């Protein structure tokens, strides 16, 4: 009975995913970060425009996303590539 109870507790913790575990890209090269508490969104947003027509982007965890036509705001792991 104790084994069953312990198993249920472990399964509950895993299913509830206690704590903040959202992972976001934080660089163009693919570096990732576990987001701090309170930042539950991943974002990729345009910060400048190069003369050849390419955008420079910033990648980060955030609590509120920037608005813009080329920006990505999402809430699942590694969704801001």
UniProtKB/Swiss-Prot annotation:
Determine if Transferase is one of this entry's keywords: no
Modification after translation is described as: Contains 4 disulfide bonds.
- Disulphide connectivity of cysteines: 24-42, 35-61, 65-73, 74-79
A biological process (GO) of this protein is: venom-mediated perturbation of transmission of nerve impulse in another organism
**Which one of the record's GO molecular function terms can you name?**
acetylcholine receptor inhibitor activity
Q: Which UniProt keywords apply?
A: Acetylcholine receptor inhibiting toxin, Disulfide bond, Ion channel impairing toxin, Neurotoxin, Postsynaptic neurotoxin, Secreted, Signal, Toxin
GO annotation, cellular component aspect: extracellular space
Is Ion transport given among the entry's keywords? no
Q: Which residues form the signal peptide?
A: 1-21
Subcellular localization is given as: Secreted
Q: In which tissues is it expressed?
A: Expressed by the venom gland.
Would you identify the family this protein belongs to, as annotated?
A: Belongs to the three-finger toxin family. Short-chain subfamily.
Q: What does this protein do?
A: Snake venom neurotoxin that blocks neuromuscular transmission on both avian and mouse nerve-muscle preparations, presenting a postsynaptic action through the nicotinic acetylcholine receptor (nAChR). Reversibly inhibits twitches in mouse phrenic nerve diaphragm and irreversibly in chick biventer cervicis muscle. Has no cytotoxic activity towards C2C12 cells up to 180 ug/ml.
What protein name applies here? Answer: Mipartoxin-1
Q: Per the UniProt entry, what species is this protein from, by scientific name?
A: Micrurus mipartitus
């Amino acid at each position: 009975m104790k084994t069953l109870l312990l198993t249920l507790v472990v399964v509950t913790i895993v299913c509830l995913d206690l704590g903040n575990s959202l992972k976001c890209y934080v660089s163009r090269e693919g570096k990732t970060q576990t987001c701090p508490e309170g930042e539950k969104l991943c974002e990729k947003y345009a910060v400048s425009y190069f003369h050849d027509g390419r955008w420079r982007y910033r990648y980060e965890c955030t609590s509120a996303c920037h608005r813009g036509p080329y920006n990505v705001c999402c809430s699942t792991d590694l969704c801001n590539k």
